Amino acid sequence: MPRKGPVPKRDVLPDPIYNSKLVTRLINKIMIDGKKGKAQKILYTAFDIIRERTGKDPMEVFEQALKNVMPVLEVRARRVGGANYQVPVEVRPERRTTLGLRWLVNYARLRGEKTMEERLANEIMDAANNTGAAVKKREDTHKMAEANKAFAHYRW
């Protein structure tokens, strides 16, 4: 903990093409070893693929996908009298978007298509249609929270 109070959150700059901070955050999630140019190329190509296949604005598809992937509840481990309980808690809005972006990118990486552009485009389109691995992760997270509802009174 710093002595001078809470450290202010750094704000990201909106990306040059779509003028969106969400897109910048997605680019940062895709980026490996500081190669931002490569990450941008991957995302913009993926967006072109989405535009080509759906005929819709890729930003709308992406926002819908993110909305379908963002979790509302999650479980957190809480130690009570020598036992660990999985306590369901509500996810804060900032963490909600962070988890949504992280899951989209991680599950896109695990897909079988040849290039990352195709994987990302397909994962985003699947998520927009409420299918795909990232949406399944959200459903599993909600199921876990629902199953452990009995421990909700241990919230902190």
From Swiss-Prot:
For this entry, the protein name equals Small ribosomal subunit protein uS7
State the function annotated in the UniProt record.
Answer: One of the primary rRNA binding proteins, it binds directly to 16S rRNA where it nucleates assembly of the head domain of the 30S subunit. Is located at the subunit interface close to the decoding center, probably blocks exit of the E-site tRNA.
Question: Which molecular-function annotations from GO does this UniProt entry contain?
Answer: rRNA binding; structural constituent of ribosome; tRNA binding
The annotated subunit structure for this chain is: Part of the 30S ribosomal subunit. Contacts proteins S9 and S11.
Q: In its keyword annotation, does this UniProt entry include Ubl conjugation?
A: no
The Gene Ontology biological process annotation of the record reads: translation
State the family it belongs to: Belongs to the universal ribosomal protein uS7 family.
